Amino acid sequence: MNREGAPGKSPEEMYIQQKVRVLLMLRKMGSNLTANEEEFLRTYAGVVNSQLSQLPQHSIDQGAEDVVMAFSRSETEDRRQ
């Protein structure tokens, strides 16, 4: 298994995808993103749209720790595929 990244994706593409996921999770948990972070999400709107459908569907009331754990499980499953 190649832990460096997904087949067919450059390290830069993987970085962008992971950063988008983290920013979306932070936003979903109620964090205020900086202007630079919001601009990053606007710049990579296509990646944002694909990642939104992959985010765990958990209530914000569930608590940040539970949401982060669900995100971690999702990341692990993505790497196995």
From Swiss-Prot:
Coiled coil: none
Subcellular location: Cytoplasm; Nucleus
A biological process term (GO) from this entry: negative regulation of mesenchymal cell proliferation
Phosphoserine PTM positions: 59
Gene3D superfamilies hit by this protein: Beta-catenin-interacting ICAT (1.10.10.490)
Cellular component GO terms, alphabetical: beta-catenin destruction complex; beta-catenin-ICAT complex; cytosol; nucleus
InterPro entries: ICAT_dom (IPR009428), ICAT_sf (IPR036911)
Molecular function as annotated in GO: armadillo repeat domain binding; beta-catenin binding; transcription coactivator binding; transcription regulator inhibitor activity
Pfam family, one: ICAT
Function of the protein: Prevents the interaction between CTNNB1 and TCF family members, and acts as a negative regulator of the Wnt signaling pathway.
Subunit field text: Binds CTNNB1.
Protein name: Beta-catenin-interacting protein 1
